[in-house]
Amino acid sequence: MSVSIQDFGKSTSGQTVKLATLKNDFIEVQLLSYAAIIHRIIVKDRKGNPVDVVLGYDTAADYELNTDSMGAAVGRFANRIAGAQFPLYEEIVHITPNQNGNCLHSGLHGFNHTMFDVALTPGETDSVRMTATSPAGTDGFPGNFDLTIQYSLAKSGLVIRYGATTDAPTVCNMTNHSYFNLNGHASGSALGHRVTVDADFYLEADTASIPTGRKLPVKGTPMDFTEEKTLGLDIGADFTPLTDCCGYDQCYVIRDSGLRHAAWAVGPETGIRMEVLTTLPGVHLYTANFLAPVTAGKDGAHYAARDAVCFETEDFPDAPNHPNFPDTTLLPDKPYSSTTIYRFDLAEM
């Protein structure tokens, strides 16, 4: 096991971006201090060859300029808030709209656009800790919001622990927006990936991907991943949630509670299997339908729509506007914490 921190490059404003590397005999993870980005996850395929399974860029500036939050920590409220406003006790909080009058991923200055401080975790030999603050009023959100993300390397996976505090009531929903291709980041379409999602329901959403508040059953629909199937099997079905989003882009309601399995995916060409575990109530399955063509990805790679799949563990989108959803209010005396694990092994083929 080894952990190191070194310079990666400069941001567009001239700030130094750090690269943290966590490595053992099976897996190597590289993280950036800009947006707490997961830059590389390298695991061995069934032939013993190293494979980088996340899409990304070679420079800090390219990460800054991309609009897809590639690999980034997203918050203070990930996903969408309808009408860029929400009730908080006796007030209506107005935040920055940045997508069709709604707020996506916290507006213009979320953590996916923030420089973090990074350091070795005191007393531990397998992790780094990243910290950042979103000042009160950033994009309209109340409260000074202090975020800590601890990235730890387990024997076969990456453990992400989020912790947040505030000095005034606000809202919180953290996720990571890595784009996975288990055949290798430069291998093209991910639609051949075999996927399972441990959810009997998904959140109904309107044409702007705003939840209606209803949970719909997956059984008998193309949304059903309770039994393993390829991403491409039903993605072209004449089914409103798929046609509205040009593919999968929905929040699934994970069974049970606590730290438990949420999803699995297998890259058929490498045999690499990824298991997603989380303490959060939802996982957003996104097949990179709107990924803009990239001609300068990592290692000279070209990326296009559907070349990856995201498993964004999360609280429910637009939760502050839906009293029937799990509460996402963050209070000064009620710190936020959640855990997500990406665990890797080799599937039987």
Summary of predicted features, one role per range:
Residues M1-M349:
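An exposed, glycine/acidic-rich loop-and-rim segment of catalytic or binding clefts
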